[in-house]
């Protein structure tokens, strides 16, 4: 039989059972620690016991289920609101797989990143460059969608934080500042300026919060300003990231458009040598169309680049186009039908060249839409006059199209027709230019070329007015002096 070698005192055992496991208590509403204060051993023990109590309370299976249900509902509400916005105001985005994929990739990536950082305590959430979201969406899409996507993502990320209000306010303001300060991105210096402005907005707003909640400037949390600085530096990586996203999702940024619009580009240089008249027409058009697009809130850099490349197909048969002819007209040896086919082929030839030189789809769209589904009217009318009794097949004289389906394409079509027609005016007076612009654009409107694009009558009136002013300046119009009556 084994006998115990050590027996505790009954008195000690009885007394020890009365000893409390706690070594202090915290009253309801009592302040544990203030921002900027040093954590001593006593405070650490209180905070640690608070953490354990939270974990204990969250261990309940029922509570976990309810928490999960609440999170799913929370996420679902904001995703529904964002998709409703797209349906109401950007329904065309549903037809672009790359657009939706990019938006939802951002919506998934940033909340997941935030959750990992908070759960693993990797670093402060404020080093994450959330302002990169509106920059990316603004560059590839539009500012309104950029703001909506940014707010949605910030609200989804805030679910991972215990005290999200300060986070939400800081990030929403920083996003608004980023959108406003970066209306277009064509140079690296623009992004540097935006990163600086975003850092300043973070710092000023956080400083305002501290002034509101603190009564002692010595307690300011300087570490947060270091986080904001790191955030601004990381924001600069948006520039190389844009190139990667372009390739993955099939977008075209202003940076790429600026590079393409360089007239030393091999394709444009070749056009200036092979079809110099067409090249000069494209340059004039680029300035005219870009100014008009900017006036009505369109993408001026996109229109400028599209204008430079819209007629590259004329390089295949340059002599068949009047601006490249020098006294000899090769159409005289062709029938009207054959001539029409040669003229129409500059669209298909242009698309082939664009494909060969890897031009973006948005530029190819300008090539295919700048004549829409219009007729080669000169040859069609000439053929019709020679064969008045014949039922003419219009498709032989019609461009393949389609008609313009964006505001920028509509502006390009108007600029193309007006600039080309203005060269044939017998005299350049204010009246002749005004009449020409009105006649050409009113005819395009009446024939339904712009029915499929989101351009308004107000936009068209603005474009007409700008074209008149620009053409008057280009051709140095003079006032027509009245004749003296006898």
Tell what function each PLM region has:
Residues 88-283:
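Generic detector of multi-pass transmembrane helix bundles and their immediately adjacent loops
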């Amino acid at each position: 039989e084994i006998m115990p070698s050590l027996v505790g005192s009954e008195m000690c055992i009885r007394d020890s059972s009365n000893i409390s496991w706690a070594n202090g208590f915290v009253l309801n509403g009592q302040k544990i620690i203030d921002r900027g204060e040093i954590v001593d051993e006593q405070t650490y023990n209180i905070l640690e016991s608070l953490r354990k109590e939270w974990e204990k309370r969250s261990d309940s299976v029922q509570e976990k289920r309810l928490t999960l249900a609440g999170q799913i509902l929370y996420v679902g509400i904001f995703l529904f609101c964002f998709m409703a916005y797209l349906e109401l105001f950007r329904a065309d985005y549903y037809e672009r797989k790359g657009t939706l994929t990019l938006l939802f990739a951002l919506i998934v990536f940033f909340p997941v990143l935030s959750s990992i950082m908070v759960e693993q305590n990797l670093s402060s959430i404020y080093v994450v460059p959330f302002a990169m979201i509106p920059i990316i969406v603004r560059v590839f899409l539009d500012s309104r969608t950029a703001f909506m996507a940014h707010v949605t993502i910030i609200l989804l990320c805030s679910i991972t934080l215990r005290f999200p209000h300060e986070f939400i306010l800081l990030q929403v303001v920083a996003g608004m500042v980023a959108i406003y300060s970066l209306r277009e991105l064509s140079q690296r210096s623009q992004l540097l300026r935006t990163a600086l402005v975003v850092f300043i907005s973070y710092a000023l707003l956080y400083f305002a919060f501290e002034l509101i909640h603190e009564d002692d400037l010595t307690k300011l949390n300087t570490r947060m300003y270091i986080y904001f600085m790191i955030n601004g530096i990381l924001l600069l990586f948006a520039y190389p990231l844009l190139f990667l996203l372009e390739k993955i999702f099939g977008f075209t940024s202003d940076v790429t458009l600026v590079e393409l619009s360089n007239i030393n580009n091999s394709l444009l240089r070749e056009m200036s040598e092979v079809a110099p008249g067409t090249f000069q027409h494209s340059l004039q058009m680029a300035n005219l169309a870009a100014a008009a697009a900017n006036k009505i809130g369109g993408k001026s850099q996109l229109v400028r680049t599209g204008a430079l490349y819209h007629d590259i197909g004329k390089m295949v048969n340059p002599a068949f186009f009047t601006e490249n002819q020098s006294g000899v007209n090769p159409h005289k040896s062709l029938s009207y039908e054959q001539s029409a086919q040669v003229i129409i082929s500059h669209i298909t030839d242009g698309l082939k060249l664009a494909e060969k030189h890897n031009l973006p789809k948005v530029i190819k769209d300008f090539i295919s839409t700048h004549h829409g589904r219009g007729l080669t009217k000169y040859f069609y009318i000439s053929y019709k006059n020679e064969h008045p009794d014949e039922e003419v097949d219009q498709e032989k004289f019609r461009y393949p199209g389609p008609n313009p389906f964006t505001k920028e394409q509509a502006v390009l079509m108007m600029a193309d027709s007006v600039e080309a027609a203005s060269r044939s005016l017998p005299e350049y007076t204010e009246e002749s230019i005004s009449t020409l612009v009105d006649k050409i654009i009113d005819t395009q409107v009446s024939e339904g070329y712009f029915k499929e694009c989101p351009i308004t009558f107000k936009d068209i009136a603005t474009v007409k007015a700008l074209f008149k002013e620009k053409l008057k300046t280009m051709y140095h119009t003079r006032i027509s002096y009245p004749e003296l009556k006898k």
